[in-house]
Amino acid sequence: MTSDPVLSIRAASKTFGSRRALDAVSLDVNRGEMIALIGPSGSGKSTLLRSIDGLQTIDEGEGAITAFGGPVQARGKVSDQVRKARVRIGFIAQQFNLVGRLSLFSNVALGSLGRIPVVQGLLGWWPKETRDATMAALHRVGVSEYAAQRANTLSGGQQQRGAIARALVQKAKIILADEPVASLDPVSARKVMEILRDLNQSDGLTVVVTLHQVDYALRYCDRVVALKAGQKVYDGPASELKREKLIDIYGPEFEDVFWEGAPQ
């Protein structure tokens, strides 16, 4: 990993009505890291992730977000240069974000739209390079046999793997995954997390993933950032996140819901 962060968040705040979703959050993400964002519901995890991609504007003020050294947003306004960052950032949502009536192949091939004319892509006139990259990505995530099927006929796990494949066709250098396993059964969830971990370790992709499942955060991610009421309350190695801190983050009920063998 290099010392220069690929993502930099400085004093980012976001208010919805009277609720402070983010409260002066600062964070650097280095190239090749796999980071879990954890915290109770409403702690600001998804708001932070969407703000990093410029999908959510932060409040006016001193807050600023950069990606690859270029501006994403600052002082309550998304930069007019944000597209330069977005073409290298793959965003994976909880609800899969696939077009149900299109085949899985077409959904994944749409990742190339930043490099080919939009009309060509919308008509499905994919150049050979895109076709080859799409099949390679589908094979990489283990769903190539479903390439011709409509996305809405696939299971949630298959669709989520398709969303990851689309990020590969996009040639993303960073994957932002917002609760990617929240809607999946345990087997599918583990498979998705294993794929993200493999892309991080084998391909050097930077991954930032929001998770409700603390055990997945500790198992698959080297670094954990915890938010509580919009504030960053932990940022460090997963191996050092102990029971006492987790109870502080989630409350006393954490003892009752956490899996057997939790950190001491």
UniProtKB/Swiss-Prot annotation:
One GO MF term: ABC-type phosphonate transporter activity
InterPro entries: AAA+_ATPase, ABC_transporter-like_ATP-bd, ABC_transpr_PhnC, MetN_ABC_transporter-like, P-loop_NTPase
CDD domains found in the cross-reference section: ABC_PhnC_transporter (cd03256)
SUPFAM superfamilies: P-loop containing nucleoside triphosphate hydrolases (SSF52540)
Keyword tRNA processing: no
EC number(s) recorded for this UniProt protein: 7.3.2.2
Primary location: membrane
EC top class named in words: translocase
Annotated positions binding ATP: 39-46
Sequence ranges assigned to domain ABC transporter in this UniProt record: 7-254
Catalyzed reaction equations: phosphonate(out) + ATP + H2O = phosphonate(in) + ADP + phosphate + H(+)
GO CC, alphabetical: plasma membrane
Official protein name in the record: Phosphonates import ATP-binding protein PhnC
Gene, per the UniProt record: phnC
